[in-house]
Amino acid sequence: MNYHNITKDDMNNGDGVRVVLWVSGCSHHCPECQNPQTWCFDSGIPFDDKAKEEIFTELSKDYVSGITFSGGDPVDNFLTVFLLMKEIKEKFPDKTIWCYTGYTYEQILSCSIKKGLNYLGLLKMIDVLVDGEYKKDLRDLDLKWRGSSNQRVIDVKKSLAENKVVLWCD
């Protein structure tokens, strides 16, 4: 997997102060996307141990609430993202994981993206999912943590427990 950037002390992509990993590669290509430079899977730089350590250093700070995966689409980078999320949950159990994706919660839950991959396992690593493609005709600048009104901010843990989508409230 390649990535474009690791943003530190971010307060725009999830609750609290966060570190954000901007992955390369997105299959959605939403018109007027804010990050079209992240669409190509080969763009950016290879995600390596140095990048992982940079993230872990940030997550070890008391004031950092957690990590946000964005891009690109983290779900399109399933294996590397899943393994990194798993390691973060083990090393930093009190930190939250947010994930932005163009896929819907239902698509991920049904494993309908690519057969043979454990998307339920991925969902179990995520605390809050911001789902759905960006739709320029539904753009709303007053929405918190999302760009268009079709997107949802989902409490994944509660959604899995209640077997229905439960929106995350701030």
PLM regions with names:
Residues 127-135:
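Non-cysteine beta-strand/loop elements that form the S-adenosyl-L-methionine
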Residues 25-29:
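Short pre-active-site segment immediately N-terminal to redox-active cysteine/selenocysteine motifs
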Residues 1-22, 35-41, 165-166, 170:
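N-terminal [4Fe-4S]-dependent radical SAM core
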Residues 81-89, 139-170:
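P-loop/Walker A phosphate-binding loop and immediately adjacent motor/lid segment at beta-alpha junctions
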Residues 76, 137-138:
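Short glycine-rich, flexible loops that bind phosphorylated cofactors or substrates
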Residues 21, 73, 129:
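Conserved, mostly hydrophobic/aromatic
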Residues 2-3, 17, 35-117, 121-122:
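Conserved Radical SAM active-site core
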